[in-house]
Structure formats: C-alpha cells, structure tokens
Amino acid sequence: MTLDLDATKKDDKLLITTIQQEYKILAEYKMIESEKLSGIYVIPSYVNSLQWFGVFFGRQGLYMESVFRFTILLPDRFPDDKSLPTIIFQQDVIHPHVCPYTHSLDVSHAFPEWRCGEDHLWQLLKYLQAIFSDPLDSIRGIEVDKLKNSEAAELLITNKEEYMARVQKNIKESKDHIFDTPPTEDPHYIVFEKFQQDVHGPVLERIKAGRSKQTEPSVQQANGGHATGLSWVKEGEFKPLSIE
C-alpha cells in the first residue's frame, strides 16, 4: 500500500511539473506574438511542445529573399535548464554561425547559458534575424577558429563575391523546395500552397482592405476554434500573404 501511495505521489508531482512547463512554454509563445517579429514565423508542434517549426524570410542584406525552414528543439527541462535551445535549419545555409554538417545554429556567442526568467525565445529569434541581416557584424570580435563554419567566415572576409554566390545558391535551393510535401503529418507544420485565385483571392482582398483582423475570429470558428498551420504565397513570389 505504501509503495502504491509513493508511486501516486510521484505521478502527481510529474503531472504538476509538466503542466507548469507547458504554461511557461505557452508564455514564451505569447511573448513572441507580442513582439510582432517581422519576417520570421514559429509555432510549437501539435504533439510536442518542446519542438517548434519555423520559417525565416530574409528581407534585407545578403540573405534578402531567402526562405529558410528551421526547427527549434527545447531542452527537456526548459526553461529551468541552463542548456540552450537548438536551432536546426532544414537545408544547407552558408553562414559563419551555422554548422555545415548538422545545419545547427551556434547561439552560444550571444547566450553562453540559458538564464530562466531573463532569456526568452523571442530574443533568440531576434538574434537569428540579426546575424542574417549583417553576417559580418555578427562575427566581429570573435576568433575565426571559434566559429561553427570558419571557412564561411574566411570567405565572407576575403572574398565577398564568392560568399554571395554561395548564399544565392542556398536561396535558390530553398525556394525550389518550398512547396514540397511536408516531412511530418503534424498539423502545426508550416505549409505553403501555390496561389489559387478562387481559394486565396478573397483572403488577399480582405487583407488589402484592412479587414483581415476583423474576420479572423470567424475563420478560426470555421476551423473548430483552432488556427491552422496553412499559409499562402502569391504566384511568382515567396512572401506570405500577411498585413506586413
């Protein structure tokens, strides 16, 4: 009987800890929403809140017009653990801070360790934006051999034209696969469809008329109260239809 009670207490404690963690992760997502980050979209997986799906749209600098998908993996004890979240791109991305083998982004230069209550995911995403906006500035003051991709760093410093050519190759490859079948059946995976006038035209017109926010509740109601991971891009372009 005593063993059964101990097991029940442990289960209850684990459940409470899990619920508390879920609330903390939800709070992180709400903070990201309130920051209104431009050109970057993320959403937690439907089945695992420790895995997030994201897409980065380059809007300036060398990476302008890039469309890079990435995944964020949160530590098991996030945000209480000092371990850092992991950002992994789904394709080749040449950048001094991106490992050419694992496609993982090194965030340790900005976040030596995760400080619960001080560091937040929106700051991590702002850092991602910053290093792509100005890659040269992002490596200033850092020894080349301490960067994830020292070859990319050397190229950026000594042969910018070749570096830009490789970036353009990455951008083309990312665009070529933007409409690929999703690698997962997770309903929160961010999906892009080619523009269809009969399906997406009315939405585009509402956005142009500035009525998208007013119609949002009815759209969610039609989906059973849940927003979907679906997005649309205009034909011939690789920009999501949004108010921005």
Curated annotation (Swiss-Prot):
Gene3D superfamilies: Ubiquitin Conjugating Enzyme (3.10.110.10)
Taxonomic lineage of the native organism: Eukaryota, Metazoa, Ecdysozoa, Arthropoda, Hexapoda
Name of the molecule in the record: Protein crossbronx
Domain UBC core: 20-176
InterPro entries linked: Ub_conjugating_enzyme (IPR050113), UBQ-conjugat_E2_core (IPR000608), UBQ-conjugating_enzyme/RWD (IPR016135)
UniProt signal peptide: none
Pfam families listed in its UniProt record: UQ_con (PF00179)
Lineage top rank: taxon: Eukaryota
Family: Belongs to the ubiquitin-conjugating enzyme family. FTS subfamily.
Species assigned in the record: Drosophila yakuba (Fruit fly)
Any one biological process term the GO annotation gives: defense response to bacterium
Disulfide-bonded cysteines: none
